[in-house]
Regions:
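Intrinsically disordered, low-complexity regulatory segments
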Residues: 1-178
């Protein structure tokens, strides 16, 4: 048996118009003594309509529309949301901790600190809301947004803040049969 010394020679391959990176190579023997090789690859993809995302609290959803950044609503400070979710999704899935993460994340973002936004943290919601008021926001984290296409003020205040979302494996490009 010839032994080949592995040298990390990560490469980029183009397959199906996608850049694919080789992260790891593993050459080993199984329990029966046969050689095997494992290759871990990763592909960079832009989100498309139908891709599935989830917050840390299990608030799942799929992309229903992709709007150019210039057309997204914006705050008085010029902050534009990356995603807009249906507010009815929070009570129906009972992901109330996501609201706590959003408000705490907004406070910590403006103060420049890190924090624990989980339900196991020692922050009380009323304390977080007080801190939000102290830095100049409404205690319920609502803000006035303006229409990105017309510049007009939206009719209602919008609950806005940072939340960590991650893409799930359910991607449209993997499910299409073309």
């Amino acid at each position: 048996t010839k032994v080949i010394k592995y040298e990390d020679d990560s490469k980029i391959y183009k397959t199906n118009d996608e850049q694919t990176y080789i992260d790891k190579n593993l050459i080993d023997k199984n329990g029966d003594g046969y050689n095997f090789c494992k290759v871990k690859v990763r592909t960079l993809r832009k989100p498309v309509i139908g891709d599935k995302f989830s917050s840390r609290h299990g608030q799942k959803g799929t992309i229903g529309n992709i709007i150019p950044e210039c057309d997204m609503p914006f705050t008085e400070n010029g902050v534009k949301p990356d995603i807009i979710i249906n507010p009815h999704a929070i009570p129906s899935r009972m992901t109330i901790a996501q609201l706590k993460e959003t408000v705490l994340g907004k406070v910590l973002l403006y103060l420049g600190y890190f924090g624990d936004g989980t339900s196991f943290g020692d922050f009380e919601v009323k304390d977080i809301c007080k801190m939000l008021q102290d830095i100049g926001f409404e205690s319920n984290s609502n803000e006035i947004l303006y229409n990105g296409m017309t510049g007009e003020q939206l009719e209602s205040n919008i609950f806005i803040g940072p939340v960590f979302y991650q893409r799930l494996k359910h991607m449209v490009n993997d499910k299409q049969h073309s």
